């Protein structure tokens, strides 16, 4: 299991209370297809839409991953900066 998959799984678990059916389907389908970047993007969008906080430690790990990820073409880092923490 990759570090990115583990991070995505932890983010999904932390954000699960704010998922609707479409979010849940999208996130877990993308994870199973190996599209963690897209799953993380959907998780952050759901968290922002519902104003749901994410644990600070987990958000720090996401920011560290984003700092080295070449795949931020949809503004994920900007959206992540707006997420509330617990």
Regions found by a protein language model. Name each.
Residues 1-86:
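C-terminal-biased regions
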């Amino acid at each position: 299991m990759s570090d990115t998959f583990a991070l995505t799984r932890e983010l999904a678990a932390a954000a699960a209370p704010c998922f609707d059916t479409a979010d849940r389907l999208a996130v877990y389908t993308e994870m199973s297809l190996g599209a963690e970047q897209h799953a993380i993007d959907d998780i952050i969008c759901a968290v922002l839409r519902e104003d749901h906080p994410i644990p600070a430690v987990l958000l720090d790990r996401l920011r560290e991953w984003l700092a080295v990820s070449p795949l931020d073409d949809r503004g994920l880092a900007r959206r992540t900066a707006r997420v509330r923490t617990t």
